Amino acid sequence: MSYAGDLNPTEAWKLLNQDQSAQLVDVRTRPEWMFVGLPDLTSLGRRAVLQSWQVFPAMEVDDNFVAELAQQLPDMEAPILFICRSGGRSRAAAAALTAAGYRRCYNVAEGFEGNPDAERHRGKTGGWKAAGLPWVQD
């Protein structure tokens, strides 16, 4: 594994609650943030960092991702938790930041919505939303 490890959404929430230096980075696209929703960290006195791993609509990896995120999160020792829809993009982002020298990068393995259920709907069988963690939608 090329990053610190995988956390399920409940473990991620616990770490964010216990360690004020921990940051949650949502690497989904702007349309996903707008139409699907966002993790709500206001009860912890902060907000998720929004930095897309891929550029919409082409969905190519953003070559500036690491540099832009490093400007926002200069503490290379703080825990950084990456979340996407279901864990794939966030895993790649965690690996990229680890390769750049960040020491405690975690993937929220089930993501915000988790995998689809038998009816091909997300957000019901796994992920941040299904875990009953706080989230908001515009």
Predicted regions and their residues:
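Short, surface-exposed ligand- or partner-binding patches at beta-edge/loop junctions that are enriched
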Residues: 82-83
